[in-house]
Amino acid sequence: MLIPVLLFIVGLLCLIKGGDWFVDGATGIARRFHVPELLIGATVVSIGTTLPEVMVSTTSALTGHGEIAYGNAIGSVICNAALIAAITIAVRPGKVDPKSLRTPVAFFFVAAAFYAGVAYTTGSFTRPVGLILLAMFVAYIVCNVLAMKNAPTPEEEEQAEEGPFAKELGLLAIGAVLIAVGADLLVDNGTLIAQALGVPESVIALTFVALGTSLPELVTAITSLAKGHGALSLGNVIGANVFNLVLVSGVSVTLAPFSIPQNSTIAGMNASLVMDIPVMFAVMLLLTLPALIKGKLSRPQGIALLCIYAAFCAVQFSI
């Protein structure tokens, strides 16, 4: 037990430093190309912080643990919205630009509707489903690149001092590597600790593994807040949730198709269909609708999301 605990701590340290460097590199690139931080957060930063989910879900699917791959994707979406974004909003509520949110939010709900449709109709995620999800990923990237090219140039970013471009790319790359390695250490050794305590695999997938692979987003969110980049944090969370459905699930399903887990039930019905997917939609609606309609996020909204996440985890450990 001592070695897993030590490796868990090493992973946490890698995540913290990796998140710091990754945010520095991403914001430097955003200033250099005069791109709004929200758009950078929804693409470049999201890809880097979603690497752990890609690695964990793909490995799980290839080794015959499809329930972990499935639970990790949905669990990470819930964790990102109801824990990470919630912390960001509760600590620093404020205004956001609805126009910058429209593309990632629209893509998320289109992907989520397709994902839920497959789960409720067939329950089997086949290779064609994975290819469709990957096609959505490509379309999302193209739309964001076009948005970046057409984005207006903020005056404050024009006046900001730019560092060496090679340094910014280096910070971005090294930060991403540290995040991926750190999350891998956390998930592997954290799962060993959880199993030693008798926690079921299905619960680990939706809670512990999802939280572990979402730690990069949490570290990036906290680091962004500390550096005064709240827009980057929110954009990262929403972009990461899009990637969890179209990239993470797309890659794992294409390489190793799987079905939704059948080992957990609520009132005799599949727990994922009754609770997991509905909660995923609920927390994302609560997170995004106020931002799109009013252009702002409030502290009560963040607290409500945190309460939902706490209740979700409590139910997972009780069924």
Model region roles, listed by residue range:
Residues 1-319:
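Hydrophobic alpha-helical segments, chiefly the membrane-spanning helices
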